Amino acid sequence: MKTFRLLTALTLGTLLWGCAESGKKAEGPFYTDIESRAQLHDWFRYAPERPIVVSGHRGGMVTGYPENCIESFEKTLSMMPSFFEIDPRLTKDSVIVLMHDATIDRTTTGTGKVSDYTFEELQQFFLKDREGNVTPYKIPTLEECIVWSRGKTILNLDIKDVHSSSVGI
């Protein structure tokens, strides 16, 4: 229950921080621009006249698009109303990046632990899609993802090895 409350607070905080920082409205096929806690609750409340909303676990499962990648989030949002569960991890130089696993072996062209690399070192690798195909995409930072998400979608942070105070919410 404590973990659920923490994740809810982080999700809400990320969403509202993004809305407060956003000076302009984003436009896209299924973008969601939520400006208050009440709107957030309404958005998650079932209403038969509204389209079904998908939780994109790690960003979705589209061939050619890797998990925990902004381009994947954008692709999923182009197809359906979505919010995204993402996985923050800490690099050796304390940059928060998106990566589900503690290692980069499965999802990138590199090997080893995320925490053994600096952010700059991680940028030499390319992300792979779920079939293992190499894509042109790189590992994003949590900050890049939050900036991208403003006025577009909701992020649900699945806290791994990053302390919640590091997220700044």
Regions found by a protein language model. Give the residues of each.
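Bacterial Sec-dependent N-terminal signal peptides
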Residues: 1-27
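Phosphate-group recognition and catalysis centered on beta-loop-alpha active-site segments
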Residues: 19-169
